[in-house]
């Protein structure tokens, strides 16, 4: 049996990261989609939207290396009906599928290419592989950690079981 390629590993890891995020987003109780841990924090729905934006950013960045880093925007999303949140979570799932497909099909020479990287104050060049892993996948893991904290706080506030954290 052949060893998996770095592309297969990236795609598999990408799907695992997204599924873990989706598990947490799906456990949010109805009516809590706009909840935020502090008044200036991103809400739960804002976090989901931000992850969709970071996937779209990655696609643009690979097409145009001059694309600048983006940041999350508290208050960007306002969920009025649960169906809106369900659509948002479906979009998050779909962008995760597109991201995994991108990773599965990306060429070795593209992954090793060095492009402009303005993340984390570096303002220098990084490999495309590093941007995929650090600026996208690790970024999602960071926000999933925040979401896990949101869920724990909601559980404490409501005194009711809220999904697996």
Show which residues each predicted segment covers.
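A very general structural signal that marks isolated residues within well-ordered alpha-helical segments
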Residues: 27, 53, 98, 105, ...
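Short, contiguous pre-domain boundary segments
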Residues: 1-6, 79-80
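Surface-exposed helix-capping loop/turn segments at secondary-structure junctions
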Residues: 27-34, 102-112, 152-159
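Short, contiguous alpha-helical
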Residues: 7, 11-15, 19-22, 32-76, ...
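Acidic/histidine-rich alpha-helical segments that form the ligand environment
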Residues: 24, 79-117, 126-142
């Amino acid at each position: 049996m052949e060893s998996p390629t770095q592309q297969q590993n990236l795609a598999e890891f990408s799907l695992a990261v997204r599924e873990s995020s989706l598990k947490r987003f799906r456990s949010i109780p109805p009516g809590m989609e706009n909840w935020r841990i502090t008044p200036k924090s991103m809400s739960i729905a804002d976090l989901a939207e931000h992850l969709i934006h970071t996937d779209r950013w990655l696609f643009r960045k690979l097409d145009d290396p001059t694309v600048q880093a983006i940041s999350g925007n508290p208050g960007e999303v306002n969920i009025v009906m649960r169906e809106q949140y369900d659509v948002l979570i479906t979009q998050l799932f779909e962008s995760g599928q597109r991201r995994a497909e991108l990773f599965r099909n990306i060429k070795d020479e593209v992954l090793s290419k060095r492009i402009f990287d303005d993340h984390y104050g570096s303002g220098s060049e990084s490999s495309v592989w590093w941007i995929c892993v650090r600026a996208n996948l690790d970024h999602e893991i960071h926000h999933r950690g925040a979401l896990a904290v949101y869920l724990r706080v909601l559980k404490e506030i409501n005194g009711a079981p809220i999904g697996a954290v």
